[in-house]
Amino acid sequence: MVWIWATIGLLALVHILQAWWKNKKKRLPPGPRGFPIFGSLHLLGEFPNKDLHRLARKYGDIMYMRLGLMPTIVISSPEAAELFLKTHDLVFASRPPHEGSKHISFGQKNLIFSEYGAYWRDTRKMCTIELLSNHKINSFKSMRREEVSLCVESIRAAANNRGVAVDLSDKVSSLSVDMSCRMVLGKKYRDEEFDERGFKSVVREAIQLASAPNLGDYIRFIAPLDLQGFTKRMKSVNKAFDNLFEKIIEEHLQPNDGERTMDFVDVMVGFMGSEESEYRIERPHIKAIMLDMLVASMDTSATTIEWALSELMRHPKAMKKVQKELENVVGLDKMVEESDLEKLDYLNMVVKETFRLHPVAPLLIPHASIEDCTVNGYHIPKKSRVLINVWAIGRDPNAWTDAEKFIPERFEGSSVDVRGNHFQLIPFGSGRRRCPGIQLGLTVVQLVLAQLVHCFDWELPNNMLPEELDMTEEFGLTVPRAKHLLAIPSYRLRKSA
């Protein structure tokens, strides 16, 4: 065992000396000095986005640090984000190696974590045109209406028990899972149809493992040792998904009787075996994209809805303002339709403000530099990991007045949106690696939020005051509430609605 650690130490020393010699005459961005091998990993705690924000105040909005042996650039202002995601977009369009994606997502064949190249370009094109186009999103409109109505009816039944709180976090999460499964896989899956751990449990474990600080991501040559035991768990999760996806693909290869709605898997199966691109699309590629679509659609939307409801309950005036707008646009005789969403200006301001204060992925997904590059006079080494701290950007006092406060009205008359064109608000990223599912995500978030606020009045349990609502976060691949949101509903539409 001693010789293993001695070898690791020697290899690390050689790596550090090579990097130092290569970069010693080049001007790197300012940043903290790190320790041998581990770099500045010790500076990151439970909430890395907040720790990096604190360091950026000292070193600047373009900061260099080593995390393990990985050269890392941290971006903390809209101006710096524009340089990396627009001016030099192509250079930073790749992804660093990721142990979680390697073992869970079928060899990093998914869209989110795959390296920049022909496979990523063709896969993104397929997803954008075939899976996430406005036409495809609209084809699932009736499904969304049905699932949201079921959720409303469930809460309405609970509201009959006056004074009893509903677990809104659980309700929204279940709704998001059901919609995602029907859209991607063609039907809802009960836990017992998956394996003994249950569908939702395995999805949560996959997200947890993908976001866990894995030493193998930062000190690459120790990854095979699996010192933290993550690899074994990742392979177990992958096996569970593989078994399910194999069964689903086989079902979709059978002739459609005409009664089943075409879902995402039908589209992807149609590409299987195709050699029109530089590679042949096989089952592992389809399974990786299926997993991407599931996790990205179910977890991100639910987290944003949960935070938006939390902020509205903490700010009763904003809640009343949203409800008043819904009364004027929709009326109290019926539920919200998707066609109403574009008329709900204040609701859309609430959604933007929620994305600003509670970005689902506060550091986005890490970018990687394809080659050496000079940005703003700084040398950025090839294969650097680039972290865009959108959490810090959303709180930049140079970009936002009263940046820590929830003020939806700040967007009144403003052209700022969340689609990656305004770098002070980029919850979906920007440039080539911008999330291709923006329209789907916005539609789901706006529809579910509007419906829950329109159909019900909400009261915090145990006579809790709005300012007493716990807003603690739980950091991961996404950042949900640490504690579930509980609230007492009372139905507010006319009884015939």
UniProtKB/Swiss-Prot annotation:
The chain crosses the membrane at residues 1-21. Its cofactor is heme. Its main location: membrane. GO terms for molecular function: heme binding; iron ion binding; monooxygenase activity; oxidoreductase activity, acting on paired donors, with incorporation or reduction of molecular oxygen. Keywords: Heme, Iron, Membrane, Metal-binding, Monooxygenase, Oxidoreductase, Signal-anchor, Transmembrane, Transmembrane helix. CDD domains: CYP71-like (cd11072). InterPro entries: Cyt_P450 (IPR001128), Cyt_P450_CS (IPR017972), Cyt_P450_E_grp-I (IPR002401), Cyt_P450_sf (IPR036396). The keyword Membrane applies. Its EC number is 1.14.-.-. GO terms for cellular component: membrane. It is an enzyme of class 1 (oxidoreductase). Disulfide bonds: none annotated. It is found in: Membrane. Expressed in fruit kernel, seedlings, leaves and stems. Belongs to the cytochrome P450 family. PANTHER family: CYTOCHROME P450 (PTHR47943:SF2), CYTOCHROME P450 93A3-LIKE (PTHR47943). This is Cytochrome P450 71AU50. It comes from Prunus mume. The gene is CYP71AU50.
